[in-house]
Amino acid sequence: MEFVKLQCNICFSVAEIKNYFLQPIDRLTIIPVLELDTCKHQLCSMCIRKIRKRKKVPCPLCRVESLHFNVYSVNRNVVDVIKCSASSVAQWNKINANFDAASLASVLFEKSLLDDAEDNNANADDTMLSEAQAILKKLQVDIAEQTQLNIKQQLDLDKLQQTSVSMQEKLDKIKSDYNNMHKSFKELQLKRITTEKALKSLNDDYAKLASKNAKLSSENKVLSNKNIELIKHKNLLQNEYTTLQSYKCITNATITTNVTINVD
């Protein structure tokens, strides 16, 4: 990213940070928007000073109080965080017009001022050439990295597609097994219903046969009783018949005797 604009969430002041990574010299950058230590919301130093209550800063966005805020400093490949007390922010100066930050920095930090006006004129071409070479080198590196990334992504995509095909095959097999099991389950249900109907029919037939058997048993008992009575009656008749036969024989003998006597 070549540059970025940051905005205070309260007063909406804008700060722009430009990236100098293409230039061969080191660049020191202080990120102007400050971060509340507790809730991590970002404000400018003036808003922190104005909304501060004693030693604490109540965040106007989430109402969480912070005792400190963080300042981030970037130097080449190192990022430092400076933890500052909220009570340490104080107004240094104020004028009617806007400050020229560059002029103010040249006065405040005079001992650290680097005068590169002559170097800019003498080394303009070298700087442009260095920037162009750095841009070309970075583009080559980016292209190589992107190519490797594309190859890796393609390999990952192929692997993912193979995995997807394998999973689809497994899913189709699971669906087929499920359909077969469902079909078998339906068949078992039909067999169970048929068996239950047959069992019910057998139970009904058994109940009918049991009822008929009980009726026949009752009738057989009645017939048995009648048969006993008939046997008794037969025996009685047999005895009477025997008695009659005996009486008949006696009678016949008596008659024969009487006839014989009369003849004589």
UniProtKB/Swiss-Prot annotation:
InterPro entries: Znf_C3HC4_RING-type, Znf_RING, Znf_RING/FYVE/PHD, Znf_RING_CS. GO terms for cellular component: host cell nucleus. The keyword Endoplasmic reticulum does not apply. A zinc finger (RING-type) spans 8-63. It comes from the Viruses. One of its GO terms (molecular function) is zinc ion binding. SUPFAM superfamilies: RING/U-box. It holds the Pfam family zf-C3HC4. It is found in: Host nucleus. Transmembrane segments: none annotated. Keywords: Host nucleus, Metal-binding, Zinc, Zinc-finger. The keyword Transport does not apply. Plays a role in the proper expression of late and very late genes. This is Zinc finger protein CG30. It comes from Autographa californica nuclear polyhedrosis virus (AcMNPV).
